[in-house]
Amino acid sequence: MKFSPLVDELIQSLRCLPGVGPKSAQRMAFQLLERDRKAGAKLADSLAKAMSEVGHCQSCRTFTEETYCPICVSTKRGHSEVICVVETPADVLAIEAGGHFSGRYFVLLGHLSPLDGVGPDELGLDLLEQHLATGDVSELILATNPTVEGDATAHYIADMAKRHQLTVSRIAHGVPVGGELEYVDSTTLALSFNGRLPM
């Protein structure tokens, strides 16, 4: 069934979000139009404002409205000579929520994927290399995803960092806390055995 052109346009627009299919988009559109027009107007305003004002930090490439993000300009971060390399701004939020890292970040905005036309230039690795060349960085922590592309990206960056005589490490992978072994896949289990620690 066809709705009015504006309703159809709203439904189609909502489908651009990850995990939102036609039925979910229709439910969202109807919720906003039927029950919460004020929230819909606020959503539209926030979205328009974010799209026009949010860009990327010129140092780490995460999202910010300023030239540099709050993390990069903070004088309270304890290990500013340590850079954690992540794939997305969402990864920065996840690590910050844990509260166990007090260094700086570099956001790749993706991973190496030659088949998709994503090479080192698209990931801003020239900017990362500039950071490494300053001599202000002592360690690079690679926190790319444990995928084929994430592994390839980590190896590429590790080789680049070693040319600058930096300490390079990669975050550990293995059995999650609270996980049960019978539900863990064989690759994760192998990583857990290979990365075991003495007690």
UniProtKB/Swiss-Prot annotation:
Signal peptide: none annotated. SUPFAM superfamilies: Recombination protein RecR. GO terms for biological process: DNA recombination; DNA repair. SMART domains: TOPRIM. A zinc finger (C4-type) spans 57-72. Gene3D superfamilies: 3.40.1360.10, 6.10.250.240, RecR Domain 1 (1.10.8.420). GO terms for molecular function: DNA binding; zinc ion binding. Belongs to the RecR family. May play a role in DNA repair. It seems to be involved in an RecBC-independent recombinational process of DNA repair. It may act with RecF and RecO. This is Recombination protein RecR. It comes from Shewanella pealeana (strain ATCC 700345 / ANG-SQ1).
